[in-house]
């Protein structure tokens, strides 16, 4: 079971992934992987941080400014992604009932280790819920079920996706 969620920025992909993770944990399932949250300063987005779903470890994925690796205005910290995000996915492959990856996008795919572990997840039988940057839909749409989140359907999709996951985990 592989479920991918896409949608416009700010529509609630991360919120949906986190709500599903919390509900699954509440029901006793072991959830692994990570989510990515915005870092804001004075109401402006200045970066992104990764938070692991098993240990709540946090690290900065990207921040506005100069760096060796850039995506748009953000410097991407590949070492942080590799040491925290990739390791969380590896643990989840071994120990979790489901893997959640938020998100599959340009920043994350700057890391070779991230690309490799995502390939490993896709090839495995481990259930996956991943959010997809809209530019990456074509790469993943044939690898699982794709949902497009909108403001109008996000409550309905929460129930629908949660029920589909629960049916697959039984």
Swiss-Prot record:
It catalyses: a ribonucleoside 5'-triphosphate + H2O = a ribonucleoside 5'-diphosphate + phosphate + H(+). It is an enzyme of class 3 (hydrolase). Keywords: ATP-binding, Hydrolase, Nucleotide-binding. The keyword Lyase does not apply. Pfam families: NTPase_1. InterPro entries: AAA+_ATPase, Nuc-triphosphatase_THEP1, P-loop_NTPase. Its EC number is 3.6.1.15. GO terms for molecular function: ATP binding; ATP hydrolysis activity. ATP binds at residues 7-14, 98-105. Belongs to the THEP1 NTPase family. Has nucleotide phosphatase activity towards ATP, GTP, CTP, TTP and UTP. May hydrolyze nucleoside diphosphates with lower efficiency. HAMAP family: NTPase_1 (MF_00796). This is Nucleoside-triphosphatase THEP1. It comes from Methanocaldococcus jannaschii (strain ATCC 43067 / DSM 2661 / JAL-1 / JCM 10045 / NBRC 100440). The lineage of its organism: Archaea, Methanobacteriati, Methanobacteriota, Methanomada group, Methanococci.
